[in-house]
Amino acid sequence: MLSDSFQFICDAQKHKARHLKPIDETKQIFLHSANQKDYLCGMKLDKRFQIHSNSLDPKQGDILISEPLMNDFHFGRSVVLLVDHSEADGTFGVIVNKQLDVSVNQLVDDFPDFDAPIYLGGPVAEDQIFFMHTLGNLIPDACKIMEGLYWGGDNKTLDTLIATGIANEDNVRFFLGYSGWESGQLVGELVRNSWLVSHVSTDRLLTTTPSKMWETYVNNLGKDYEMWKRFPMNAEDN
């Protein structure tokens, strides 16, 4: 049985997510990017790259910072916001630092005039668009993630807020797909030091340049993680 908040979010995915236009050949290439390998690098971590303390239990509103050796199309050098987490029921999140070179207007039929970018949310439900925002109760059925940050809600209300200029690129973000873990799966990845659990404020999350987010948040971890930034994104380049 899912927790109440997790069930609400899962129901929202089924009933409130926007589906993409039929995907033409160009978008098909875009979505699957050269069939890059989806696997975690099997290299044994040098002590300089290991997570020194990973005892912080993940919770709703936390972020996951991927370790530098993770070689995965979606999760390599990623920062994942945990929209909801339950030890019993699993984890739901979105990648927040991978902005795509496509706007929501290009992918969703009958969308208001809103040339906002879309972010790669994760490998699950990549035929659907989701959104988070700072508009709170202005959007009915929105689910609070943390102070000042909300997930989803009524699409028609969002359209109205966009048309009136209340909703804009500064307070709404769209995601293609999402990231999910079954019960115990994320904990297992934390034990294997695949992720570091941290936390940032809503303002920090929304104002950090996406392409610099992983490096910026690693900087905040201190000198113990200095080597993370020096490791090449492709180990074969080293």
Residue ranges and their predicted role:
Residues Q13-K14:
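Low-complexity, glycine/proline/serine-enriched flexible coil segments
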Residues L31-H32, D38-Y39:
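Short, positively charged and aromatic/hydrophobic N-terminal segments
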Residues G42-F175, S179-N238:
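A short aromatic-anchored loop/beta-hairpin motif
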